[in-house]
C-alpha cells in the first residue's frame, strides 16, 4: 500500500511539472514598472507614506514601490543625481525590469531631470510624475529621453497655492501640466485629487510632444 501511495505522488508530481503549474506562493510577474519615489530638500522616504498607501489600495504591489533617501538633504544635483542613478540601477537589477517610473516632489523633480539629462537616465524611465517640482532649475521642457522607440511621458502637478516652488518652475513644455487650487506644497504629498492624477500618470497618462 505504501509503495502504491509513493507511486501515485510521483505520478502527480510529474503531471504538475508537465503542465507548468507553479506553487501558490510563487510571486506573480508584475505588469507595471517599479516606482521610485524621490523626495525634495530636507525630505525623506517617509514623505511618500500616503502616496504608497494609496497606490497599494488601488491594487499596486508594495514590493514595486521604492523610496530613496538622499544623503545630501540640500537637493544638490551634483550629489543627488549620481545617488539616484545608482539607486535606480539597483532597483532594475533587483526587479529585472527594463525601466522604472518616478514620482518626484519638489527638488526631487530637478534631481530626476538632471539624472535623465546628464547621467544616462534617458532610457531607464518610462513615466515621470512631479509634484510641485522645481523642474525648471534643470529643464523647462519635457525631456524625451534616449529611447528612440518610446519617449518619456511626463505629468507635472502643481498648485497655485504653492508658496515654496513657483508654478513657472513646475511647468514643463510638452508635458501634461495640471494646475490645482487650494493645496500647499507639502499638501501635494497627501491630497486625494493629486493621488488620482499620480495614478493616471503612472499608467501612461502623461504626455510628451517634444
Segments from the language model and where they lie:
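Alpha-helix N-cap/loop-to-helix initiation residues
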Residues: 44, 73-74, 137, 187
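C-terminal catalytic-base region of ester-bond hydrolases, centering on the histidine
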Residues: 144-210
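Sec-dependent signal peptide cleavage junction
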Residues: 15-31
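Intrinsically disordered, low-complexity
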Residues: 24, 28-29, 124, 147, ...
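Bacterial Sec-dependent N-terminal signal peptides
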Residues: 1-5
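Serine-dependent carboxylesterase/thioesterase catalytic core
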Residues: 33-39, 46, 56-62, 68, ...
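Typically the conserved alpha-helix immediately C-terminal to a functionally engaged Cys/Sec
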Residues: 50-54
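Hydrophobic helical h-region of N-terminal Sec-dependent signal peptides
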Residues: 6-18
Amino acid at each position: 500500500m505504501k509503495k502504491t501511495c509513493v507511486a501515485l505522488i510521483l505520478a502527480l508530481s510529474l503531471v504538475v511539472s508537465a503542465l507548468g503549474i507553479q506553487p501558490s506562493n510563487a510571486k506573480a510577474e508584475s505588469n507595471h514598472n517599479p516606482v521610485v519615489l524621490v523626495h525634495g530638500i530636507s525630505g525623506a522616504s517617509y514623505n511618500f507614506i500616503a502616496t504608497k498607501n494609496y497606490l497599494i489600495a488601488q491594487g499596486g504591489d508594495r514590493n514595486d514601490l521604492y523610496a530613496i533617501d538622499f544623503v545630501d538633504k540640500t537637493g544638490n544635483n551634483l550629489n543627488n543625481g549620481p545617488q539616484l542613478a545608482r539607486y535606480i540601477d539597483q532597483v532594475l537589477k533587483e526587479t529585472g525590469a527594463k525601466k522604472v517610473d518616478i514620482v518626484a516632489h519638489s527638488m526631487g523633480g530637478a534631481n530626476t531631470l538632471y539624472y535623465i539629462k546628464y547621467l544616462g537616465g534617458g532610457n531607464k524611465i518610462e513615466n515621470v510624475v512631479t509634484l510641485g517640482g522645481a523642474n525648471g532649475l534643470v529643464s523647462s521642457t519635457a525631456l524625451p529621453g534616449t529611447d528612440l522607440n518610446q519617449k518619456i511621458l511626463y505629468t507635472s502637478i502643481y498648485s497655485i497655492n504653492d508658496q515654496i516652488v513657483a508654478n513657472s518652475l513646475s511647468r514643463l513644455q510638452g508635458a501634461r501640466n495640471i494646475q490645482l487650487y487650494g493645496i500647499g506644497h507639502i499638501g501635494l504629498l497627501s491630497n486625494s485629487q493629486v493621488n488620482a492624477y499620480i495614478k493616471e500618470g503612472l499608467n501612461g497618462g502623461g504626455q510628451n510632444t517634444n
